[in-house]
Amino acid sequence: MTMRPFFSAAVHHLASPRGGAMPLFLRRGGTQIFFNQGCRATQFATPRDLLLPTGRKSYHSSVATFSSSADVTNGHFMSYAMLYHDSVAFLLSNQLGIPVFMAEDPKTPVDVAKEFNLSVRGASALMVTLCRMDVVKVVKDSDDSVDEILYGLTASAKTYLSDRKDRACVSPFIDTFQTNFITPDALLESCLKGDEKKDIMSEHLEQDDETVANNARHFMAHMNAQSYCCARALPKALGLESVKKPTTLLDVGGGSAIYTIEAIQSNPNMKGIVFELPAIKVITQEYIDEANLSDRVSVATGDFFKDPLPGCVDYVLFSNIFHDWPDEINMNLIQKAYDSLNPGGKIVISELLLADDVKSSTPAATSMNVIMMPYTKGRQYRPKELLRRLEKVGFTNPKVINLVDDYDLVIGTKS
């Protein structure tokens, strides 16, 4: 059980014509490229087979077609255009706290309407959409009206949506997509020629240390929800649980240290180093102290654009780093990782990858690729692109393994 349906339901919307954007602090300074609608909309695209009509009972299955082939309809284009509204329903439900309200007992739309001062018609519309998304399931059907259906939370929704105090809850991450929207004009601006225009990520990093730290604290708190499942899956994926000798993992740009903490907790032979900006160190240390790992995890400060990475380590981890930056910077990071590793050490790149055959890419990956346009100077990579780059630097036995859901690890070994 993972949070894929909910995490993946937030990215697709961001790449749609009025998709949800990133947190408020990333608003572009001089140019008004976002506007607040006050409506709650997003979702990282659900798996393709859930998004597209199946032909069994789709809304358009009986619509007459004008194609020369009876097997070709316009349904999937219509579906993509309309999915924005599913995102709106999902985000509004999260904002209201419907999953929290339903955590203990099944509810009808009438119950939901009464609790949140909604119309029964409105509550029913939300519940039908949440049911398709596997947030709720039908406990008792009604032949008379969807307004009378009794719904209960699914097991995955109970784990990832119903308790905001639980680290596994993805709701804080979903909250970040509630207010800002990438407009078509903003997306066009980011797609136009002109290397001189600044991306929002770079503008954020150029602020004073206090502002960078405050923004980072806010950002980390929300992004931990996104990283939870990936971080928990990392030790098993890398075989860290069976390490027999002292081993050091370097987490570059590790922020809240969520990956490092999970790795170190998996094995007493593991130690960790989080490499972060000086302005971020205090915040990273707070997370380490909270996990009672200050004796095994340290914070090294520096700027990975300018400074060498700490040396004599056995793993160098880049999690969601490469998609933020252009290729020349990433090649430099790969070289720095190679230089910092002990012989036999491994570089580990965790990313939401496009498919080598781009048509087979997941909706989450293609949507994230579009999201990168206004926010960063980067993009999502294909596996073969990263494998080739590792080989160019000198890494051997490059491979790709699945981490969790749509996230993969690209791994290379230093000879």
Predicted features along the sequence, with ranges:
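Core SAM-dependent methyltransferase catalytic element
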Residues: 394-415
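N-terminal chloroplast transit peptides
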Residues: 1-39
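Conserved Class I S-adenosyl-L-methionine-dependent methyltransferase catalytic core
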Residues: 71-110, 114-247
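N-terminal mitochondrial targeting presequences
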Residues: 55-68
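Conserved adenosyl
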Residues: 166-361, 407-408
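C-terminal alpha-helical "lid/dimerization" subdomain adjacent to the S-adenosyl-L-methionine
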Residues: 348-393, 398-399
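Short polybasic linear motifs
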Residues: 23, 46-47, 54
